Structures are given as C-alpha cells and as structure tokens.
Amino acid sequence: LPRALKSRATVNQLLEGKLQRDNKDEVIAACDLQNILDRDVHNLSGGELQRFAIAMSCVQKANMYMFDEPSSYLDVKQRLNAARTIRTLLDTDSYVIAVEHDLSVLDYLSDFICCLYGVPSVYGVVTMPSPVRAGIKIFLDGYIPAENMRCRQESISFKIADTGEELELERSS
C-alpha cells in the first residue's frame, strides 16, 4: 500500500482526502486508528496498514466494495470490528464482496457465500451463492450438493477436546 502512494502523507490526511461519507469518526474508532492518525502511512505495521486500508474504503461512497482477506494481520477483536465496520457499508444501493479464509469472520460478515475451486492456471469454478451456514458446510465438506460434485477429496473437520492431553494421546497413537 505505501508503494502505491505517490507522496508521503499521514493517515488522517489520506482519510480526509477520500472522505465521501459522514462516518469518519465512527470508522476511525472501529478500526482503532486514533493513535496513528498523525503517522506517515509508510511507517505503519502490517496490522495498522490493514486497518487503514479498510478505513479508506469505508469512508468512500461506492456501489460495490471489494475486500481481499480483510482480517489478515488483525487480532480477533480487530477482525470482528473490521467485519462489523464493513457490514455498515451495506444498503439497498451497495454491495460488498469479500474474499476471506477465516470462517468465523466469514460467518459474521456474510449473507451469502460462493466457494471457488479449481486448478491454478488451468480452470476455476465459482459455486452459486448459498446461505452462510450452507456455504461454510460446502467448503468444509468439499462437496457441492446442487451440482452433485466433489471439489476436494477430503472433508475438513475439527476435533474438540477437553484438554490438550487428549490431543497428544491421539497424535502419538
């Protein structure tokens, strides 16, 4: 992001320059930018840059907003705040498209999910939109019921254990 900027500027200057909505203070608070408003964008960490990039999108008016992994470099609290802030962009005249691999953020952020699968540099397929829970199930199962097609050989599953010892015993057996 800093390389895309032609000149050096502070977080606040850049937000002011793109301000098209009456939500700057709310976005600054939600993205936790209060302490970095006077800092040069070239001096921000990865997480600070991510929060700044989200804020820059959120202060602008658009018919469609696109976010590529908005939760990258953010801690859990920041991820939920980012998702909450992004959801405020939705109205009858605007849409949000997000690519996200964190299923909890995806669950919170989305109304519908499309899964993408294929072979790099060969082909790619996008599923029809599914409700959130069904879309996450398609992703985890690797099976698309509407197309009667498997997009991955193995399902992804999670094991729940009361203690770490149970997991250690299972791994060693």
Where are these regions (language model features)?
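ABC ATPase nucleotide-binding domains
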Residues: V126-S173
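ABC-family P-loop ATPase nucleotide-binding domains
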Residues: L1-G46
